[in-house]
Curated annotation (Swiss-Prot):
Lineage per the UniProt record: Eukaryota, Metazoa, Chordata, Craniata, Vertebrata
Membrane-topology descriptor: Multi-pass membrane protein
Subunit structure: The cytochrome bc1 complex contains 11 subunits: 3 respiratory subunits (MT-CYB, CYC1 and UQCRFS1), 2 core proteins (UQCRC1 and UQCRC2) and 6 low-molecular weight proteins (UQCRH/QCR6, UQCRB/QCR7, UQCRQ/QCR8, UQCR10/QCR9, UQCR11/QCR10 and a cleavage product of UQCRFS1). This cytochrome bc1 complex then forms a dimer.
Additional observations: Heme 1 (or BL or b562) is low-potential and absorbs at about 562 nm, and heme 2 (or BH or b566) is high-potential and absorbs at about 566 nm.
Function: Component of the ubiquinol-cytochrome c reductase complex (complex III or cytochrome b-c1 complex) that is part of the mitochondrial respiratory chain. The b-c1 complex mediates electron transfer from ubiquinol to cytochrome c. Contributes to the generation of a proton gradient across the mitochondrial membrane that is then used for ATP synthesis.
Keywords: Electron transport, Heme, Iron, Membrane, Metal-binding, Mitochondrion, Mitochondrion inner membrane, Respiratory chain, Transmembrane, Transmembrane helix, Transport, Ubiquinone
Listed name of the protein: Cytochrome b
Subcellular location per the Swiss-Prot or TrEMBL entry: Mitochondrion inner membrane
Length: 379
């Protein structure tokens, strides 16, 4: 009798995706982050669901309801901090996952890559809206500053911003709709992740060499299930260390002050995972220019397949491109640091140089490095 997991309509899908899936024999720990992102998403949905049971999306009670969750709800504090720090872990995994894709040329799977970019945008939107919900000072002013950027769009900008706000400023209507969107978006992300996986399984996984691995496949279970479990244990360990020892390490102290439209905090800045984009936004003195640079800093990922000039897929055997990649990583870390600094000398010029470098490395230096490597190998 044939195994039920191979015949049952539902179990067959799970089997083909997680059990009998043919996987390359040589994929490294950089391939763990896909499953870790899945774990992060499930964790965020579950903790978020329990938070939503006690949260009130109203300007007068939102801040108090979060305090109530932390003080009065059984284990509310751990749920709240797992959700807040879970977002940080989510973005760490996201950046690693995207970085892996760039390094090993995974962007040549066009559909998978493009859905991945959409997933990145959706996750960033969700995190932004979630940051507004506690209705602290940084929640309110972050929402005001970021939504206001849309007013830079010619002709329709002002109307668009007021439409999003549901009034003439960030107020009750804004908070309510942000809560509604923040609740629904993770489920949209989950659906998109399924499509992401569907397209990936059409081609099979890439591997560190970038060479087709059809001749050497192994079953996903037990080899990569056990490897993913190790990654998951490490993820949860780091998350719980954050939650239980330094829950506010990555947060902003200003968000423990209730939102006050009459008092602007001295330094308005987003959560750490948006600082690189925020630095790029601030480095351009023009409002529309800044917004365009902000969007393009992420949207540039879409054109990565067009910028691939190398005859090899992966960077594994391309030392010049490897140098470019790690300079890009250093540049992103510099931008992240600058995004959290006040707008004054020398931070302004460092931010502008780092922003120019970011686009220069991706659009010019990496493609040129690839051409040089092709010529060195006489290809």
């Amino acid at each position: 009798m044939i195994n039920i997991r191979k015949t049952h309509p539902l179990m067959k899908i799970v089997n083909n995706a997680f059990i009998d899936l043919p996987a390359p024999s040589n994929i490294s720990s950089w391939w763990n982050f896909g499953s870790l992102l899945g774990i992060c998403l499930i964790l965020q949905i579950l903790t978020g669901l329990f938070l939503a049971m006690h949260y009130t999306p109203d300007t007068t009670t939102a801040f108090s309801s979060v305090t109530h969750i932390c003080r009065d709800v059984n284990y509310g504090w751990i749920i709240r901090y797992m959700h807040a720090n879970g977002a940080s872990m989510f973005f760490i995994c996201l950046f690693m996952h995207v970085g892996r894709g760039l390094y090993y040329g995974s962007y040549t799977f066009l559909e998978t890559w493009n859905i991945g970019v959409i997933l990145l945008f959706a996750t960033m939107a969700t995190a932004f809206m979630g940051y507004v919900l506690p209705w602290g000072q940084m929640s309110f002013w972050g929402a005001t500053v970021i939504t206001n950027l849309l007013s830079a769009i010619p002709y329709i900008g002002t109307n668009l911003v007021e439409w999003i706000w549901g009034g003439f400023s960030v107020d009750k209507a804004t908070l309510t709709r942000f809560f509604a969107f923040h609740f629904i978006f993770p489920f949209i992300i989950a659906a998109l992740a399924m499509v992401h996986l569907l397209f990936l399984h059409e081609t099979g996984s890439n591997n560190p060499t970038g060479i087709p691995s059809d001749t050497d496949k192994i079953p996903f279970h037990p080899y990569y299930t056990i490897k993913d479990i190790l990654g998951a244990i490490l993820l949860i360990l780091i998350l719980m260390l954050l939650v239980l020892f330094t829950p506010d390490l990555l947060g902003d102290p200003d968000n423990y002050t209730p939102a006050n439209p009459l008092n602007t905090p001295p330094h308005i800045k987003p959560e750490w995972y948006f600082l690189f984009a925020y630095a790029i936004l601030r480095s351009i003195p023009n409002k529309l220019g800044g917004v365009l640079a902000l969007v393009l800093s992420i949207l540039v990922l879409v054109i990565m397949p067009l910028l691939h000039t190398s005859k090899q897929r992966s960077m594994m055997f391309r030392p010049i491109s490897q140098c470019m990649f790690w300079i890009l990583v250093a540049d992103l870390l510099t931008l992240t640091w600058i995004g959290g600094q006040p707008v004054e000398h020398p931070y302004i010029i460092i931010g502008q140089l780092a922003s120019i470098m970011y686009f220069l490395i991706i659009l010019v230096m990496m493609p040129v490095a690839s051409i040089i490597e092709n010529n060195l190998l006489k290809w």
